[in-house]
């Protein structure tokens, strides 16, 4: 229709808690990006890198400003409509790099507040479930609103093979689970924004 405009795409800031080359968690973000491009209209994944963030030190906050890498990171968080965290599990908890990113984003003014988020995890043992629940606990204080279901935690080292040697997701069933989670995140994020979500996941 003449004069009509397309709805603004929902932008998802996706953060991997692993800095390792070939990380399966970073591979999950790549897979999520591909899924959105191929089959979820109106949703765009922006991979936000965190390797350059310094360890949190409030002495670095000078004249109400932050180091350049932190400023750039916080700008990416502020620009997002919602978040996707891909988290490994280290020693039953959150990885250091991801906790550091959460902490930098929380410095006043809190960049995380009042937006939807989802967590996906690939790890050994329980598949990262303990890490996921610790992120949810941190998110309570940060006013992040996590979707409750579906939960996607992947026992990365159990057969059948789920990732290739570069960390790319190759399991079609997990890709479907990831798509279902992204649709749920999209619906919940739109609800928080007061917009209609034409999806079975909106309920």
Swiss-Prot record:
Reaction(s) this enzyme catalyzes, per UniProt: a quinone + NADH + H(+) = a quinol + NAD(+); a quinone + NADPH + H(+) = a quinol + NADP(+)
Enzyme superclass (EC): oxidoreductase
Required cofactor(s): FMN
Entry GO MF terms: FMN binding; NADH:ubiquinone reductase (non-electrogenic) activity; NADPH dehydrogenase (quinone) activity
Cellular component terms per the entry's GO annotation: cytosol
Highest taxon in the source lineage: Eukaryota
Enzyme Commission (EC) number: 1.6.5.2
InterPro entries attached to this UniProt entry: Flavoprotein-like_sf, FMN_Rdtase-like_dom, NAD(P)H-dep_reductase
Keyword tags: Flavoprotein, FMN, NAD, NADP, Oxidoreductase
SUPFAM superfamilies the UniProt entry points to: Flavoproteins
Keyword flag Flavoprotein: yes
Xref: Pfam families: FMN_red
Similarity section: Belongs to the SsuE family.
Function per UniProt: The enzyme apparently serves as a quinone reductase in connection with conjugation reactions of hydroquinones involved in detoxification pathways.
Subunit structure: Homotetramer.
Listed name of the protein: Probable NADPH:quinone oxidoreductase 2
Source organism of the structure: Oryza sativa subsp. japonica (Rice)
């Amino acid at each position: 229709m003449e004069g009509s405009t397309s709805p603004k795409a929902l932008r998802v800031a996706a953060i991997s808690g692993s800095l390792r080359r070939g990380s399966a968690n970073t591979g999950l973000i790549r897979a999520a990006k591909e899924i959105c491009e191929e089959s979820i209209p109106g949703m765009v994944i922006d991979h936000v890198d965190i390797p350059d963030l310094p360890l949190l030190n409030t002495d670095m906050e000078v004249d109400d400003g932050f180091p350049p890498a932190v400023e750039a990171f916080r700008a990416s968080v502020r620009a997002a409509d919602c978040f996707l965290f891909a988290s490994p599990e280290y020693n039953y908890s959150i990885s250091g790099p991801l906790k550091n990113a959460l902490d930098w984003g929380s410095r006043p003014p809190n960049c995380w507040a009042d937006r939807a988020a989802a967590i996906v995890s690939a790890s050994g043992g329980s598949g990262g479930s303990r890490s996921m629940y610790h992120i949810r606990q941190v998110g309570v204080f940060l006013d992040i609103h996590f979707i409750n279901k579906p939960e996607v935690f992947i026992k990365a080292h159990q057969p059948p093979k789920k990732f290739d040697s570069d960390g790319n997701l190759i399991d079609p069933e997990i890709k479907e689970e990831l798509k279902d989670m992204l649709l749920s995140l999209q619906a919940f994020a739109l609800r928080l924004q007061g917009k209609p979500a034409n999806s079975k996941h909106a309920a």
